[in-house]
Amino acid sequence: MNYLFKNGRYMNEEGKIVATDLLVQDGKIAKVAENITADNAEVIDVNGKLIAPGLVDVHVHLREPGGEHKETIETGTLAAAKGGFTTICAMPNTRPVPDCREHMEDLQNRIKEKAHVNVLPYGAITVRQAGSEMTDFETLKELGAFAFTDDGVGVQDASMMLAAMKRAAKLNMAVVAHCEENTLINKGCVHEGKFSEKHGLNGIPSVCESVHIARDILLAEAADCHYHVCHVSTKGSVRVIRDAKRAGIKVTAEVTPHHLVLCEDDIPSADPNFKMNPPLRGKEDHAALIEGLLDGTIDMIATDHAPHTAEEKAQGIERAPFGITGFETAFPLLYTNLVKKGIITLEQLIQFLTEKPADTFGLEAGRLKEGRTADITIIDLEQEEEIDPTTFLSKGKNTPFVGWKCQGWPVMTIVGGKIAWQKESALV
């Protein structure tokens, strides 16, 4: 099916929002211009809505295989499509871990069979993410590994991390890191700050993250490796990354929507839906994340979509697992709380969710260019809705944003020229 989207707006190559039509033919973007006509295409009048590149998320958890009670590739990618994401990068904390040929081939077969959007799987740095034996990077790359990470487990052994970075550099691949120094975690469940003190909870200090990033940056410099930092959350981490970039070290970084919108002062009670890792930090940390995003220290926004069951989250803040679901709320949360409040522009938000992650990792995604694969999301910037987890397509309903009123909701997502998801009656 060919589609002609009429009367839309998009961000052009100069970074300006302008009026446009867009023609999709044979799965590709055939033309982006005003006043397009086509005889062999279904015409869809988007009536002034935003035509954006499909969103790109380099940090997601799909849970399959091994955690299908939390999420599946099918439900997770449907939720991604509903959130406007067309390319997502799946973390390897599955069971089994994609750490060898057999496990990666199985994962890729599942993705091919079940995914509604483009899914790029990470390969693990170490076997079973155990930190003691390096995986076969060459084989994992051959089988389509996006990059290498041990995800929710920081690689504690510096010699292992250095060896991994050297091998990744030879393959022109990135090493991606969840940064925690295990000896400083302190069995914490929230940030070490006012909230932990008030509620008598063990806290995770900010330096637990930043000291690990500092170590890895020096290792990356020694290995001449592209090193990407997951979900930056502290002022100290931003400072260390900024200094590294000024020194010419190949470091990039991401921040989550929840760390841009919330800080520890916003946690109303010991509610496990506010428990994520890294935890919500202090006001100064929150301000540093915004500053880092605006000055280029932080390169992109990634959701860290981490679904859990209601039963798991009901165990209380100390025992419940870390993480919140993120696909279906990311764009409206950011548009409402950053763009509408004048903190960043719409153009910047689009870049942080599309071309910045795509360019950082060399993906042919993130831009509406003629000849490229038609990965597109249509967004209604005017429609206001309340966040209601009962409407989520994700199995995970674990969100701290219940009842938040937001604008900027995706209404249609196109992947490879085919409609992957459409809001009922939105464009008829």
Curated annotation (Swiss-Prot):
Catalytic activity: (S)-dihydroorotate + H2O = N-carbamoyl-L-aspartate + H(+)
Binding site for Zn(2+) 1: 59, 61, 151, 304
SUPFAM superfamilies recorded: Composite domain of metallo-dependent hydrolases (SSF51338), Metallo-dependent hydrolases (SSF51556)
Annotated InterPro entries: Amidohydro-rel, DHOase, DHOase/Allantoinase_Hydrolase, Dihydroorotase_CS, Metal-dep_hydrolase_composite, Metal_Hydrolase
Pathway(s) annotated for this protein in UniProt: Pyrimidine metabolism; UMP biosynthesis via de novo pathway; (S)-dihydroorotate from bicarbonate: step 3/3
Cofactor(s) needed for function: Zn(2+)
Metal-binding among keywords: yes
EC number of the protein: 3.5.2.3
GO cellular component annotations of the record: cytoplasm
Purpose of the protein: Catalyzes the reversible cyclization of carbamoyl aspartate to dihydroorotate.
Keywords: Hydrolase, Metal-binding, Pyrimidine biosynthesis, Zinc
Protein family: Belongs to the metallo-dependent hydrolases superfamily. DHOase family. Class I DHOase subfamily.
Binding note for cofactor: Binds 2 Zn(2+) ions per subunit.
One Pfam family per UniProt: Amidohydro_1
UniProt: Zn(2+) 2 binding residues: 151, 178, 231
UniProt source species: Bacillus thuringiensis subsp. konkukian (strain 97-27)
One GO term (biological process): purine nucleobase catabolic process
UniProt xrefs under HAMAP family: PyrC_classI_B (MF_00220_B)
Binding residues annotated for substrate, in chain numbering: 61-63, 93, 277, 308, 322-323
Molecular function GO terms recorded: allantoinase activity; dihydroorotase activity; zinc ion binding
Regions that span the bilayer: none
The protein's name: Dihydroorotase
